[in-house]
Amino acid sequence: MKEYYQENHRKYYDQTFSIDPTSFLLPLARCLHPGSTILDVGCGSGRDMRWLKDQGFQPEGFERSQGLAGLARAHSGCPVLEGDFEVHDFSGMKMDAILLVGALVHVPHEHFKKVFENILRALKPGGYVLLTLKEGIQDTGISGGRIFYQWLDEYLRKAIDHLNLSVVDFSRQVSKIRKTDVWLGYVLKKQEGLL
């Protein structure tokens, strides 16, 4: 699965870059001040970084696929760090916001807490997270050996309940690529004075 995005980076870019991200990025953007730093984890094609940069923010990307990282740099004009977010040490970063748009859909439920907590180390106290995950009760396999782990709202809220995050905004949106998919969107705020 990890190789899918490297081997298919151009196809993935072509499929996702032209989608207008306004509907799912605007709830986060409204919480931030101009110039806020944003880490886009699993930045993919760079589409969301480009939109955020155009709104006056300072996005940086983090991407596992070397091919996607190169395309994201070229088309967003933003720096992109290459690495595996499941093991990367994020504790040296202090960002105003973190973007996780579909980035955690391939993380099994039993690993979600550990991976999410690791990424949250990059967030300043009082910072925001945009988290989107597919809604559903079954895990669905798609071409290339990718497995998409789906969530119900109530279970996801329980999974993040202990993380000192409050839900600022919640949405359900039909996928712009596959009309049978619904994405759960959460803008979360990290409590002040907490790690």
State where each predicted segment sits.
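Class I (Rossmann-like) S-adenosyl-L-methionine-dependent methyltransferase catalytic domain
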Residues: 1-90, 107-114, 118, 128-195
